[in-house]
Structure formats: structure tokens, C-alpha cells
Regions:
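Bacterial N-terminal signal peptides that target proteins for export
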Residues: 1-9
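Thiol-/selenol-based redox modules, centered on thioredoxin-like
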Residues: 138-182
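Cleavable N-terminal signal peptides
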Residues: 9-10, 20
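Structural microenvironment flanking redox-active thiols in thiol-disulfide oxidoreductases
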Residues: 71-110, 122-125
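Short loop/turn microsegments at loop-to-beta-strand junctions
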Residues: 31, 56, 140-142
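A short beta-strand-turn-helix
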Residues: 34-56
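Short active-site neighborhood of thiol/selenol oxidoreductases, capturing the structured segment around
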Residues: 48-77
């Protein structure tokens, strides 16, 4: 009995330690989506196309609200929102959680600073090939920076939440510097 449990534990540790590959690559068109979302505890309809009309968008997928890694990541995005906004970008988190759970999460973990979207039918998760391999009912931890033209600028995939915010900010700064001055 111990050997199968030990093997399962080792496999789960390995799955967390290894980075995953983001499905969409730079230059690819990001799938458009409209989904229920929550901000500051209030629900609304979120449209990626509408958000992109105002500037670049960070779309980050996360496995489950109120789990330690997802709460850490949401808190880090919340703390960094002034930096994203100063660079003209918005952020949306996407998970397969139901909208009621995400309404609470939008207040508690996201500090009412950015919306989180419910993809309970896994339509967006599948379109972005962002299903967690070991648990397909959950989203993987993948972040994308999408330009106003709908093309992927950068992506970062790792189950470890630590570098998603800094990686997206660095990519956003680099993209912003490459834009012609108006």
C-alpha cells in the first residue's frame, strides 16, 4: 500500500515542480471569449474583445479559487495592478470555478482590483489549451499577454505562482517600449 501512495506523491510533487508549456505562442491569435466574471463581489459579462479595445490584456488561468497557490497569485496580481494600469493594460483571471465562488474570491484574494472569470464549461480553458493535464476539470496555471490586435505577445506557464506577475510585467514593458510614440 505504501509504494503506490509514495509513487503518487512523488508524481504529484514532480508535476508541481516541472514547468508546463503554454499552448499559444507569441504571434498566434488569441481566441476571443465572453464569460461571466466578478469584480469586487459583483458579477457582470466580460468580453475579451471589449477589453482589448482599451489596450493589452493579461489573461491568466489558475486552477482553483481559495487554494494557497491561486490565492498567492491573485494577491500578487492585485498588488501589481497600478503597474499594469500605468502601462495601459488590464488583467483577467480565469478558472473553472463557479461564479459565486469567484465573486467571493474577487473580494478576498483579488482585493477588488481586477476581475476573475468563470469558465465552468471549460470552453475558454480548452480554446487556450489550458487544462491541467493531471486534473482536466481544472485550469492549468498559464499567463498570456495579449495585444490590442488580439495576438499573443508573451506567455508563461508554471504551476508555481511566483513568477507570473513579474514575467507578464516584463513582457508588457518590452512590448510598450517597442510601440511607436504617439
Amino acid at each position: 500500500m505504501r509504494t503506490p501512495l509514495a509513487a503518487l506523491f512523488a508524481l504529484s510533487v514532480l508535476a508541481v515542480a516541472l514547468p508546463v508549456a503554454a499552448a499559444l505562442k507569441a504571434g498566434q491569435r488569441a481566441p476571443n471569449f465572453s464569460v461571466p466574471a466578478a469584480l469586487a463581489g459583483k458579477t457582470f459579462g466580460y468580453s475579451l474583445a471589449a477589453a482589448l479595445s482599451r489596450g493589452p490584456v493579461v489573461v491568466y488561468f489558475f486552477p482553483a479559487a481559495f487554494t494557497s497557490g491561486c490565492s498567492i497569485e491573485a494577491h500578487e496580481f492585485a498588488e501589481a495592478m497600478p503597474k499594469f494600469e500605468s502601462l495601459g493594460a488590464s488583467v483577467i483571471g480565469v478558472s473553472t470555478d463557479d461564479i459565486d465562488t469567484l465573486a467571493r474570491f474577487s473580494v478576498e484574494a483579488c482585493q477588488s482590483r481586477f476581475p476573475v472569470a468563470s469558465d465552468s464549461g471549460k470552453v475558454v480553458v480548452k480554446a487556450y489549451d489550458a487544462q491541467l493535464a493531471i486534473r482536466p476539470d481544472y485550469a492549468d496555471r498559464i499567463s498570456y499577454l495579449i495585444g490590442p490586435d488580439g495576438a499573443v505577445i508573451a506567455s508563461y506557464a508554471s504551476l508555481n505562482p511566483d513568477k507570473h506577475v513579474e514575467t507578464m510585467l516584463a513582457a508588457l514593458r518590452e512590448w510598450r517600449q517597442a510601440q511607436p510614440r504617439k
